[in-house]
Amino acid sequence: MRVEARSFVSQPLISILTPVFDTPVPWLCEAIESVLAQVYENWELLLIDDGSTTTDLLRALPALAARDRRIRLVRLESHQGISAALNKGLDLASGEWVAFLDHDDVLEPDALYQNVRLLQENPAVDLIYSDEDKLTEQGFDSPILKPDWSPDFFLSCNYLCHLIFLRRDLVREVGGFQPEFDGSQDYDLLLRVSERTNRIQHIPRVLYHWRRSDNSSASDVRQKPGQLEASWRAIEAHLKRRGEAAHVTVDWRTHAFCVRRELLEPRKISVIIPSSHDSESLKRLIENLISKTSYPNYDIVVLQLGDRDKVHDRCGDFRVLRFRDAANASATKNYAVQQTDSPWLLFLDPGAEPIEADWLTIMAEHVQRSEVGAVGARLISPKDTIEHAGFVLGVNGIAQSAFHGFPAEHPGVNRQLQMIRNYSAVSGVCMLTRRDVFQQIGGFDEALSDGLADIDLCLKMRRAGYLIVYTPLAKLYSNTPAREERDLTNEAIMRQRWSDILEQDPYYNPNLSRARADFVVGK
């Protein structure tokens, strides 16, 4: 690996910035040792002493800096805070790239190598992040295995965290670190960087070991008073810079953030419901839907399958489109879209029942965003377990619902079940999209069975550059029977069409289990 690193065509200088303040000397020694052990050798380490007061550290620092000519010791005259220390290091950094190493954490020996190796393949990238775990007295545990770039997930939490590689000039262009966000200064910086670039890459390897200590947020974010508040302010400032009317709340149970956007215009939504119910059953279904929907501008279109005399053409609050011999559900949905003119479309299974009246408004907050193609909800079974919370591709066949069977209010691994985030696909049991997007990608593929057509629709949106959003805030009960039989013919079509993304879903780390989509480490 060291020999390969020396043969890289591009061998940029990496400036590692490590602010130091009253660090236990053994821990700082471990951090420095991990840098000295790097197989990629073109680096510099800047130790920025932020006015330390402990005698043993002050005595040790010069000797530690003298261990290697690539280590530089910088002293601040007084304790100024982590942002000031990092900015000082940034001013003095000579590298084209900067990385950040906390004074008590540890790098894997190939941490720099893996990042520079990625640059050989993708020289245009601006930001690189990798996976991490916790460092304890017993060793390494609690790996955090991250998805590829997920902008909605990033507004729910700073999942990038460690290890971060950034172009030095880009960090300077966005203004460096802002002291008013100390405690979450890295989150604020990364939010500003994300406003300038989407050239963001992920290395799915644990390259950083975050020390868990009594006063570290690696153990509990509450160990650093003000960190949540600083993160909240950073997200608010980010949304304001983007011109988005929104407010941010904190889930104090999970310490995740929730962005609620202002609905700029409640555009008309056609709620498209396939049904084979008789008149009375359908009437009850519609009455329940209307009573639990506060969104002000929608109509209901029922796709009636079966005999003509089951339902009148109009039954009060909805319109009926009839199909005696429809090829499949995809064909009926495509036809229904052609018969409506609303700018937004909601595909809703008759077995779905809203729990809270603002469910459709919550989904509309996301579909109004130009970068979003489709929005899915949290679907809950009659047993109060998760029926659907976004699809993970390539798990147990073509796809499996994330956290399927988990208690409905369970946080999920690393709190992900209760966070707004991106997936490659969401369920057509409750899916909101825009007409222009639906038409751009050609609608549902009528050659595919219902469940796979939903996934295929989302993947076509992803290929066209749109995001798929899952929001756990929109909650519905789902009485839709699970499809027990696999359609091998349709699965073969999907595997041929989407082989790359089925092999590796970008929103599901390759080191996670492929047996179940529960986000636990694979064996």
Report each predicted region and the residues it spans.
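N-proximal low-complexity "stem/linker" segments adjacent to membrane-targeting elements
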Residues: M1-S34, E244-N288
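A recurrent flexible, glycine/aromatic-enriched loop bordering the glycosyltransferase active site
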Residues: S83, D91, D141-F165, Q338, ...
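Donor nucleotide-sugar recognition loop
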Residues: G175-L191, G226, E353, R421-Y477, ...
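Conserved donor NDP-sugar-binding/catalytic core segment of glycosyltransferases
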Residues: D110-D141, E353-G397
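C-terminal, non-catalytic tails of nucleotide-sugar-dependent glycosyltransferases
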Residues: M1-V9, K224-P266, K383, V395-N422, ...
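Nucleotide-sugar donor-binding/catalytic module of glycosyltransferases
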Residues: M1-Q223, A237
